[in-house]
UniProtKB/Swiss-Prot annotation:
CDD domains registered for this protein in UniProt: FBPase_glpX (cd01516)
Binding-site positions, substrate: 88-90, 119, 164-166, 186-188, 210
Cofactor(s) required for function per UniProt: Mn(2+)
InterPro entries given in the database record: FBPase_class-2/SBPase
Any one GO CC term of the record: cytoplasm
Amino-acid positions noted as binding Mn(2+) 1 in the UniProt annotation, renumbered to this chain: 33, 57
The protein, known as: Fructose-1,6-bisphosphatase class 2
Residues holding Mn(2+) 2: 85, 88, 213
Locations listed in the record: Cytoplasm
């Protein structure tokens, strides 16, 4: 992928983050997401490329912008597949909490798994334990494998888990095994990246989150040499088995079949992201473990962005200063 595109993509997440920031702490996650989506789409359409959204805000009948299959860019130049999550952590943005980021991953045509917006079970580790995880095995066995490979006891292992009611039993199991839990309210994209950074203090991420976030995170994981396995899970197997959830689950299974992917089947990293020629970029909205959040003084705002290129295995942290009046005028905010 053209190196110049990588910088362009970092500008996209910066704009989305700055748009979301206007709704920081205002209690309206939908308004924050809408602002980020509009800014991201506007910036994508300025780029000289022939791109398609493959992971986005939903199907064409569910989302007016950045829907799966939408064409973005000038329509000329390099063929690009794009996975976006304008805000990973909409609730955290609305409530002014930590770890909210804007995310984009890009690769060549057919780089990313095409999957519906549904639940996904994920197990993520860094490069130092690549090749030993197996979602077909019980969690305890995976934890013991990882600890052994790292030369650690289970009591020294740190597992990142989304703090959701569906994970209460998992968190209890990890504690009973003697391992440590780092529970986060949202934002498993940032958590996945953290596991794979060279100076990571987290050994693995495990849990059930969103499939779009899983595919976007897989780009960073592959670029950083980490490992991941995942499994698409119908809604009624995660939430209560109500008639409404069964109906949604049946639709999810049908959509998976149309895309050529099976539910409850283990997907390896190479199934999620098929090529190293990719870019992952994320910009902090609020302060977090991965990135600093936006800081504003009058008309000036500073952002921090991580930019990872798969082919060269480079990790860049970009700190930028933005004149907000000019930017918000362009974005019509």
């Amino acid at each position: 992928m053209n190196r110049a595109l990588a910088i362009e993509f970092s500008r996209v997440t910066e704009a989305a983050a700055l748009a979301a920031y206007t709704w920081l702490g205002r209690g309206d996650k939908n308004a924050a997401d809408d602002a980020a989506v509009k800014a991201m789409r506007y910036m994508l359409n300025l780029i000289h490329m022939d791109a398609e959204i493959v992971i986005g805000e939903g199907e064409i009948d569910e989302a007016p912008m950045l829907y799966v299959g939408e064409k973005v860019g000038s329509g000329l130049g390099e063929l690009v597949s794009i996975a976006v999550d304008p805000i990973d952590g909409t609730h955290m943005t609305a409530m002014g909490q930590s770890n909210a980021i804007s995310v984009l991953a890009a690769g060549g045509k057919n780089t990313f798994l095409k999957a519906p917006d549904m639940y996904m079970e994920k197990l993520v580790v860094g490069s130092n334990v690549k090749g030993i995880i197996d979602l077909n095995l019980p969690l305890e066995q995976n934890l013991r494998r990882i600890a052994s490979k790292l030369g650690k006891s289970l009591s020294d292992l740190t597992v990142m888990v989304l703090a959701k009611p569906r994970h209460d039993a998992v968190i209890k199991q990890i504690h009973n095994l003697g391992a440590k839990v780092l529970a986060i309210p949202d934002g498993d994209v940032a958590g996945s990246v953290l596991c794979c950074l060279p100076d990571a203090e987290v050994d693995l991420l495990y849990g059930i989150g969103g499939a779009p976030e899983g595919v976007a995170a897989a780009a960073a994981i592959r670029a950083l040499g980490g490992d991941m396995q995942a499994r698409l899970i119908p809604r009624n197997e995660v939430k209560s088995d109500t008639e409404e959830n069964k109906k949604i689950a049946a639709n999810e299974i049908q959509r998976c079949a149309a895309l050529g992917v099976k539910v409850n089947e283990v997907l390896k990293l190479e199934d999620l992201v098929r090529d190293d020629n990719l870019v992952f970029t994320a910009t902090g909205i609020t302060n977090g473990d991965l990135l600093k959040g936006i800081s504003r003084k009058g008309n000036l705002a500073s952002t921090e962005t991580i930019l990872i290129r798969g082919k060269s295995r480079t990790i860049r942290k970009i700190q930028s200063i933005h004149y907000l009046d000019d930017l918000y005028k362009i974005l019509n905010i």
